Amino acid sequence: WKLGMNGTFAWTPSINKGEKRSPADQSVGKQLPYVPKYSATLTGRLTYRSWSLLYKWCYYSERYTMTNNDITLTGHLPPYFMSNVTLEKGFSLRWADLSLKGTVNNLFDEEYLSVLSRPMPGINFEFFIGITPKWGKKKR
């Protein structure tokens, strides 16, 4: 058995440092639209022989939708959390290494927006098959 964990944290102060384009321009000195100021991930992996179970948790802070950073009904997107889980099985064949992987994205069926008025998918599933040929390697 092997247990591994890692995480990331990003502080992204994406500030408009340009010049005002007009007297009404309120964007200078403000966070750029759709860029979360904070984001974080935490990943845990449990491995046993050729099996691997991965859990990934993600956080994205509030994002503004307008350059003036107004917090109105349509001027910002709320923060959200996301959880994904993956189960993977590896196989070693004479001619290739094979990987079968199934993922459940948005495990808890969270409602969230990455862009205003564009709902993102609820719970969804992915299946992957990976083949790594062993060309040029001696077969035993």
Set out the residue ranges of the language-model regions:
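Gram-negative outer-membrane beta-barrel transporters
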Residues: W1-Y64
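Extracellular loop and loop/strand-boundary signature of outer-membrane beta-barrel proteins
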Residues: S22-Q31, D70-G75, Y112-S117
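Residues embedded in well-ordered secondary-structure elements
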Residues: Q31-P33, G44, H76, F91, ...
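C-terminal beta-signal and adjacent terminal beta-strands/loops
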Residues: Y59-T67, L87-R140
